[in-house]
Amino acid sequence: NLIDFYAVVPFHLVSVIEKTITSFYSDSYIEEVEDYNLFTKNSKVAYCYMHDHHEYSLPFRTYQRMTTDPLNNISNVLSKLHGHEGAAIQVMIRPVKDGWQKKGRSLAKEILEDKHHGFLSNLNPLVWIGDFLSLLMRGESKTDAEHSASRSTPMIDEQVKAIEEKNTQTGYETLIRLVAVSNSEHHAEALLVSMKSAFAQYATTDNNALHER
């Protein structure tokens, strides 16, 4: 099966996009074509939108933290289509102004201060008793210092690092749409499930994930 990549861009950016693609993929061949059509007469369609499971400040797992090329999982699903089937993954992006990073910085600070993940522990009366006894025996300043040190763990440090790394990148509003076409609703839905599963690789347990909407 042949997998095609289409890029729809404003006319004044065509040259820029062509140069960018060939700079990363020197063997690629780019040509202008008519708009494609997935659908055929009497075809059945299944589709969904993918969106972030948590707030946008939390990053996804990217290829830097993967052991394999993430495109392989996606292309493997598309390569198994039969002659009567079709599928498309549409990603629309639009850059946003700087300022979105502010929420990420605030969230990173909250995590370090244990406000974001430590709320339930603050409701535990044993924690209150322990803090009170520590305050009486060793003083407030020392207790605060110990709490600040204890709040940071390798997992928290890694999470905060990932958030801060995301804040250094250009921000985009993004729309991801998956479309599956087949000769029956059952087959179209099954194909869509396979397509959605390919995006599980971008999930992390402590940050973000892509979920169906």
Describe every region a protein language model picked out.
Residues N1-R213:
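Extended, folded cores of ATP/NTP-driven motor/assembly subunits in large transport
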